[in-house]
């Protein structure tokens, strides 16, 4: 996948993440200055899971996010298109399923809630992905999307863009087995919709009542919505 090619071929994306699975969690912690742990906890809290609920964690990668969700007592399923990523998390005691975000291997109305963290950008057609997540969610069920977003403080936003363009690729080359994956990450973040634009897309593709919460000055935003009852 070329540096500036954000028209994502699913198999290119899967192969890219297969290559980084072994060191993925450590690399993310380094690149986020340890904020990834905070963001996972806040995602769990935002989803407001109850013991016994059935939850889909899409684009779960090594399932570190799924383990965090499972602290709620819910039954959590990790689903990812990258077999290499799921294999890297083989020792994490949660259910794991290989699946494409545009054609999920689950029946209609299977889950009480669904979440996707930093993976919606990587679905070939993210609008189709939103509709597919709605399909497998029960009426009245919840969605939380954790995704990199637009910083809300202008000066901080300028610093953040400089980090994405200059420092992140350099750090990735030092700590990642596939730095091109993180160059793609930086490019895709810059091309991603703002908080308000993404909320509008979510409301137009299978969900309703979407709102969001900014984390770390808007570097990350948690978008939450409900699947309509009818």
From Swiss-Prot:
Q: Which keywords label this protein?
A: Menaquinone biosynthesis, Methyltransferase, S-adenosyl-L-methionine, Transferase
E.C. designation(s): 2.1.1.163
Disulphide bonds annotated for this chain are none
Associated pathway: Quinol/quinone metabolism; menaquinone biosynthesis; menaquinol from 1,4-dihydroxy-2-naphthoate: step 2/2
Entry's family note: Belongs to the class I-like SAM-binding methyltransferase superfamily. MenG/UbiE family.
Q: Which InterPro entries match?
A: SAM-dependent_MTases_sf, UbiE/COQ5_MeTrFase, UbiE/COQ5_MeTrFase_CS
Q: What is this protein called?
A: Demethylmenaquinone methyltransferase
Please list the reactions this protein catalyses. Answer: a 2-demethylmenaquinol + S-adenosyl-L-methionine = a menaquinol + S-adenosyl-L-homocysteine + H(+)
Record: residues binding S-adenosyl-L-methionine:
62, 80, 100-101, 117
**EC class:** transferase
**GO molecular function list:** demethylmenaquinone methyltransferase activity
Role this protein plays: Methyltransferase required for the conversion of demethylmenaquinol (DMKH2) to menaquinol (MKH2).
Say which domain of life the source belongs to. Bacteria
UniProt-listed SUPFAM superfamilies: S-adenosyl-L-methionine-dependent methyltransferases
Q: Name one GO biological process term.
A: menaquinone biosynthetic process
Checking Pfam families in the record gives: Ubie_methyltran
């Amino acid at each position: 996948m070329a540096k500036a090619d954000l028209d994502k071929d699913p198999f290119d994306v899967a192969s890219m993440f297969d290559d980084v699975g072994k060191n993925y969690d450590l690399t993310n912690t380094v690149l986020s200055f340890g904020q990834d742990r905070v963001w996972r906890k806040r995602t769990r809290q935002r989803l407001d899971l109850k013991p016994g609920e059935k939850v889909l964690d899409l684009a779960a990668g090594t399932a570190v996010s799924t383990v965090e969700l499972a602290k709620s007592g819910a039954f959590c399923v990790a689903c990812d298109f990258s077999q290499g990523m799921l294999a890297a998390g083989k020792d994490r005691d949660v259910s794991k399923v290989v699946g494409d975000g545009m054609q999920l291997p689950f029946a209609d109305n299977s889950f009480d809630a669904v979440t996707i963290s930093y993976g919606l950008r990587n679905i070939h057609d993210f609008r189709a992905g939103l509709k597919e997540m709605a399909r497998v969610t029960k009426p009245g069920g919840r969605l939380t999307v954790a995704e990199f977003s637009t910083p809300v403080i202008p000066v901080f936003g300028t610093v953040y863009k400089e980090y994405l363009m200059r420092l992140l690729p350099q750090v990735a080359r030092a700590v990642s087995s596939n730095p091109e994956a993180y160059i793609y990450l930086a490019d895709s973040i810059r091309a991603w919709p703002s908080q308000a634009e993404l909320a509008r897309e979510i409301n137009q593709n299978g969900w309703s009542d979407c709102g969001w919460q900014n984390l770390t000055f808007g570097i990350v935003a948690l978008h939450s919505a409900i699947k309509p009852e009818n």
